Regions:
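Active-site neighborhoods and metal-handling regions in enzymes and metal-associated proteins
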Residues: 1-220
Length: 220
């Protein structure tokens, strides 16, 4: 199943107030390159839509919240984003994350997070995407993507550890979430992310825009 929809006169699908809209976007600025995906609920969806969406979100949050030994390979991290789906007998065939360049390519190595072995160590100052997804052929697909920065965490007798810090500041649609499927920790990670999004962006917005953002970043 193709992962990227390219509209043509033969394949154009008009948007309707139902189902999901998956938008994978990005741009290059003088400050750097962005890569982001959001899946947005446009109207009524099925229980399957909501379950798949929540599984993808669980994987996304688990990877974003990960702390790991400095120098771990992306292959070692990949299963973190897939484990909730595997328990449901689901999987995705694309990579979980890729390096992001500045002024060059949005897909830029050598580091990657994927099932196939990639031995490049993950170290401080690397940028990488966090983009698990699930695609049901001829039905619908879901992906949620942020760009992350590897930053120092702690140093112990076992060595140096690093963690991820989100660079992407954009609300994640909470409408389709089956909240009971999220652990307390996953809810905390999502709420903390949304609080950061609001605190960073709200000073840049007018009153109407701030109110929209406040609603979109409310805790669940």
């Amino acid at each position: 199943m193709p992962l990227y929809y390219e509209p043509t006169p033969e394949s154009d699908i008009p948007l309707k107030p139902e189902g999901f809209l998956l938008l994978d976007s990005g741009a290059q600025y003088t400050d750097g390159t962005t890569d982001i995906t959001r899946t947005i609920q446009l109207g009524p969806v099925s229980d399957l839509h909501r379950r798949v969406y929540t599984l993808v979100l669980k994987g996304h949050l688990s990877l974003q919240n990960l702390c790991f030994p400095r120098g771990a390979a992306g292959t070692q991290l990949d299963a973190i984003a897939r484990s909730a789906m595997w328990r449901e007998g689901m999987n995705y065939m694309h990579g979980t994350g890729h390096g992001v360049g500045s002024y060059l390519s949005v897909h830029e190595g050598p580091h990657q997070i994927r099932q196939e072995y990639r031995g490049t160590p993950m170290v401080e100052h690397m940028t990488v995407t966090d983009e698990p997804g699930l695609y049901l052929a001829d039905r619908f697909g879901v992906r949620i993507e942020n760009t992350l920065l590897v930053v120092p965490y702690i140093t112990t007798e076992f060595g140096r550890f690093v963690r991820f810090e989100p660079l992407t500041l954009c609300p994640i649609d909470t409408t389709p979430i089956i909240v009971d499927m999220l652990s307390a920790e996953e809810r905390s990670v999502l709420n903390a992310y949304h609080q950061m999004v609001y605190e960073r962006l709200s000073p840049l917005l007018n009153e109407d825009e701030r109110e929209w953002l406040r609603i979109k970043t409310e805790a669940i």
